[in-house]
Amino acid sequence: MSTLADLRKNYSLGSLDISDVDPNPFGQFDRWFKQAIDAQLPEPNTMTLATADARGRPSARIVLIKGVDERGFVFFTNYESRKGQELAQNPHASLLFYWIELERQVRIEGTVVKTSPEESDAYFASRPVGSRIGAWASEQSKVIESRAALEAREREFSAQYGENPPRPPHWGGYRLIPDAIEFWQGRPSRLHDRLLYTHSGGAGWTITRLSP
């Protein structure tokens, strides 16, 4: 374990000041996300989604962001999966983007709601056929007998729906509506820059600096 304790990196690529950021956190996120794309980072759209059940027992996993606007952050999944069940019990969740090459993190907290059926239908229709069939074949988070059993279900639904599978009723989108968004920029000597946007309850956002 001593080797783990010795692992460290000094951060020095950038800085973050209230005078330089967008007053709207969605504008600031868009700025950073475009920079992550321009830097050709591998899958900059990956994020950690943390949920908790009714008892407060947490779980986390990597998912893909599929939409961002003033209404919130959108992702899609199986509603009957563990995360779907936890969100039904407890709609409060957190997202984390970590762009290590840029020494940046974005942490988002808020309440999750389902997207409209129309939004879910539109995104589902844009997916490759194999992924749409997979949404039917996978009983996500449930115990299965074997890989062969999963592939048999895939063949079954492929034969049933062909090239035009509809969206399963148990599959669709969620939108996290944020009430807090933190932007983190690594700095030397662990004196990192942390700016927190909080929703004031009206139409605006308040920006504060947090101690690292």
Curated annotation (Swiss-Prot):
Keyword annotations: Flavoprotein, FMN, Oxidoreductase, Pyridoxine biosynthesis
PANTHER family xrefs: PYRIDOXINE-5'-PHOSPHATE OXIDASE, PYRIDOXINE-5-PHOSPHATE OXIDASE
Protein name: Pyridoxine/pyridoxamine 5'-phosphate oxidase
Record bears the keyword Flavoprotein: yes
InterPro entries reported for this sequence: Pyridox_Oxase, Pyridox_Oxase_CS, Pyridox_Oxase_N, Pyridoxamine_oxidase_dimer_C, Split_barrel_FMN-bd
Binding site for FMN: 61-66, 76-77, 82-83, 105, 140-141, 184, 194
Catalytically driven reaction(s): pyridoxamine 5'-phosphate + O2 + H2O = pyridoxal 5'-phosphate + H2O2 + NH4(+); pyridoxine 5'-phosphate + O2 = pyridoxal 5'-phosphate + H2O2
Family membership: Belongs to the pyridoxamine 5'-phosphate oxidase family.
Cofactor dependence: FMN
UniProt record, GO biological process: pyridoxine biosynthetic process
Functional note: Catalyzes the oxidation of either pyridoxine 5'-phosphate (PNP) or pyridoxamine 5'-phosphate (PMP) into pyridoxal 5'-phosphate (PLP).
Subunit structure: Homodimer.
Amino acids binding substrate: R8, K9, N10, Y11, K66, Y123, R127, S131, R190, L191, H192
Cofactor notes: Binds 1 FMN per subunit.
Metabolic or biological pathway: Cofactor metabolism; pyridoxal 5'-phosphate salvage; pyridoxal 5'-phosphate from pyridoxamine 5'-phosphate: step 1/1; Cofactor metabolism; pyridoxal 5'-phosphate salvage; pyridoxal 5'-phosphate from pyridoxine 5'-phosphate: step 1/1
Gene Ontology MF terms: FMN binding; pyridoxamine phosphate oxidase activity
EC number: 1.4.3.5
Pfam families: PNP_phzG_C, PNPOx_N
